C-alpha cells in the first residue's frame, strides 16, 4: 500500500473534530453543513463524488445489498461498491464537463486537533465553501430564473390573449354595425319602394286630370270649362307630398295655375270672355274701365293670344275716347253753323282727302335707307298709288294708340318715326312703322290697330 493511501486511511481513522474558531465565521446553515461533513469524514481534498459517498454511505450500502425478488428465470446480480462508485464518478465528471464552472475561493483552514503521532503534519487547505452548497445555490438561482422566465412567459401569453380578445371584440362590433347598416338600408329601400307603389295610382289620377285642362296633346290651349277644377288638381298634388314624383307634378301645377290666372285676368276686362279654349273672340267688347297690361305665362301660343286680346281691348278704348271727342266737337260745330250763313257743302272726296291729310306720317324717308325688305306685308306699288282709296283711312284713335304703345316700349320718341303705306289687303290698309334711321319696327292695320313685327315676345302672325 502506497504512502499516500496509508496517509488517507490514517486521516479517515482520526476522530472527526470541528474547530470552534472556524465555526464563528460561518453562518448557522454553513456551520451545520460543515459539521455534517466533518462527522462523515470528509476531507478537503475529497472530490464531490467522494464527499457524496461518505455522507450517504448507509443509503448506498442499503441500496446495494437490499434483497430484491425476481422471477425464477431472473437472477440476482451483485455490483460491487467500487464499480458503483466508478459509474457515479463518470456520471459526475460528464455533468461537470457540460455544466458551467462555479467559481470558488480557497482559504487556509486551521488544522484540526490531531493525535500525537500526527502533530508533525502540515496544515491542510480546505475549501471555504462547500461545492455541494454552491451547487445547490446555483440550482436555486436557476430555479428562480426559470420561475421568473415562466412568469414572464405567462404574462406575455396573457397580454397576447387579451390583445386577441380585444381585436375579436372590435371585429364583432364592426361586423354588427355593418349588418345593422345593411338591414337599415334594405328596410329603407323596401319602404321607399312600397311608398312609390302606393302613390302610383295618385300619380295617374293627377296626370289624367292635368291633361283634361288642355284642348290638345301639345298643351298649347286651355279649356275654360276646366278652370273650376284647379282645386281638385291641388288636392291630388298634396297626396304626392314626399314622393319623388311630387317635384315634377308641382311644376306642372304651378305653370297651369299661372296660365289660368292670366286668361281670367284678361277676360275680366271684357264684357264677355275674349279668350275661349285658346281662341280670341274679336267681337268681345272691352269694358269702359278696363285696364290692360302685358302678361307672360311661359306658354308661347297662349302668350300670342293674350297679346292679341290686350291689343284689341286697348284699340277699343282708344276708339271710344276718340268717338266721344268727335261727338262733342260735332255738337259744337252744329251749334255754330246754325248762327251763320249757309255755305256750299264740300264733296265727299275732299272730306276723305282732308281726313288723310291730317294723319301724321312722321319724318320723311328721303335720303334714308329704309328696311323695306323686312316688311311682314309685301309692298304693292299699285295699291300705294291708289291714294284716294278709303282703305288707307285710319279708324278713329288707332294711330294714336299704336304710337303711344311704341313710345311706352321705347321703340320711338315723340314724333321721331317714319310711316309708309305698304298694301291694301281685304279692304284694310297696311302701313310700316320705321325708326328715324330706317330700322323696321312693325306692320300695322289702320282699321283694327293690330300690328306685328319680326321681334320675339309679342304677336307673330298676320291677321289675315
Curated annotation (Swiss-Prot):
It comes from the Bacteria. Residues 180-464 are extracellular. The keyword Phosphoprotein applies. Keywords: Cell cycle, Cell division, Cell membrane, Membrane, Phosphoprotein, Transmembrane, Transmembrane helix. It is a single-pass membrane protein. Belongs to the MapZ family. HAMAP family: MapZ. The N-terminal domain is required for interaction with FtsZ. The C-terminal domain efficiently binds peptidoglycan and is required for septal localization. Both domains are required for MapZ cellular function. This is Mid-cell-anchored protein Z.
